[in-house]
């Protein structure tokens, strides 16, 4: 029997993940009182002929009982029941935005600020995150991308490295991306904006792509950058990092940075790491 505990930050997607698992024939229970977990594990094993996949949702709503969870999980493991913990994470900025969009109160914020409740929850759940077998940061994931990750881990039994890369193109004229871990300035390349037939196009279109990638400096930059990234990424993983945002900036964020972000994403896709491209400013004038 596969026994998965789904937990993490409120607003990070736990309910969505439980629904995805339920759609994949998991027997799902959300917010089961912590003292009942051992009984639940025993019952699930007893019914394993009929129930082969189980998912249990646990979150901050467990209140004071959450402090007992560590001991309960140790007891479950000591009794011979194997489980996996999936921890769903997201940045404070994204969680605040999600709460504002849904007009819901954070369970720990009371009548105060949402961000204060989020930081308190983050501290209370730190011990669970440290125990997690899988950590997924949903800050930049679309629902379908999250489903792909869940299917890979819990449905198709694929491998998962707890690490996801976003290659983000942007325009310096609109400011630096707040969440970028690494930023590279590609304004040293010839600008397609000043080529009349390319001015109105973007780096997503083949004419601009061909122009940028035909530049000798572009290929040299890509080669050196890939060498550096393939050195850095395993070391980031070794230090416990689970996501990397690589900012690629040009003047307006429409031509050079878009092409190079797409090309870097393509080259990283040939490795074992999960990666996607985002273009922050491509639609801006």
UniProtKB/Swiss-Prot annotation:
Keyword Acyltransferase in record: no
Source organism, top-level taxon: Bacteria
Sites where the protein binds GTP: 59-62
Presence of the UniProt keyword S-adenosyl-L-methionine in the record: no
Keywords linked to the UniProt accession: ATP-binding, GTP-binding, Nucleotide-binding
Residues that, per the record, bind ATP: 8-15
InterPro entries: P-loop_NTPase (IPR027417), RapZ-like (IPR005337), RapZ-like_N (IPR053930), RapZ_C (IPR053931)
Pfam families attached to this UniProt entry: PapZ_C, RapZ-like_N
MF (Gene Ontology): ATP binding; GTP binding
S-S bonds: none
NCBIfam families: PRK05416.1 (NF003828)
Family recorded in the similarity comment: Belongs to the RapZ-like family.
Primary role: Displays ATPase and GTPase activities.
Name used for this protein in its record: Nucleotide-binding protein Cphy_0331
Species per Swiss-Prot/TrEMBL record: Lachnoclostridium phytofermentans (strain ATCC 700394 / DSM 18823 / ISDg) (Clostridium phytofermentans)
């Amino acid at each position: 029997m596969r026994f998965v505990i789904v937990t993490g930050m409120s607003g990070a997607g736990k309910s969505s993940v439980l629904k995805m698992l339920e759609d994949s024939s998991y027997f799902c229970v959300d917010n089961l009182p912590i003292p009942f977990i051992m009984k639940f594990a025993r019952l699930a094993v007893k019914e394993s002929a009929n129930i082969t996949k189980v998912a249990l949702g646990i979150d901050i709503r467990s209140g004071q009982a959450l402090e007992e969870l560590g001991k309960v999980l140790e007891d479950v493991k000591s009794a011979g029941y194997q489980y996996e913990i999936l921890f769903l994470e997201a940045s404070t900025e994204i969680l605040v935005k999600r709460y504002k969009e849904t007009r819901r109160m954070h369970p720990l914020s009371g009548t105060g600020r949402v961000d204060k409740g989020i930081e308190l929850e983050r501290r209370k759940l730190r011990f669970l995150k440290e125990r997690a077998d899988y950590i997924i940061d949903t800050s930049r994931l679309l629902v379908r991308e999250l489903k792909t990750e869940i299917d890979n881990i819990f449905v198709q039994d694929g491998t998962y490295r707890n690490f996801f890369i976003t290659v983000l193109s942007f325009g310096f004229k609109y400011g630096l991306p707040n969440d970028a871990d690494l930023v590279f300035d590609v304004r040293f390349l010839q600008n397609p904006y000043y080529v009349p037939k390319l001015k109105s196009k973007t780096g997503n279109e083949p004419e601009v792509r061909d122009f940028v990638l035909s530049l000798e400096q572009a290929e040299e930059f890509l080669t050196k950058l890939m060498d550096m990234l393939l050195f850095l990424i395993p070391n980031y993983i070794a230090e416990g990092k689970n996501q990397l945002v690589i900012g690629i900036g040009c003047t307006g964020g429409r031509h050079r940075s878009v092409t190079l972000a797409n090309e870097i994403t393509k080259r990283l896709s040939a490795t074992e790491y999960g990666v996607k491209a985002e273009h922050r400013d491509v639609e801006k004038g």
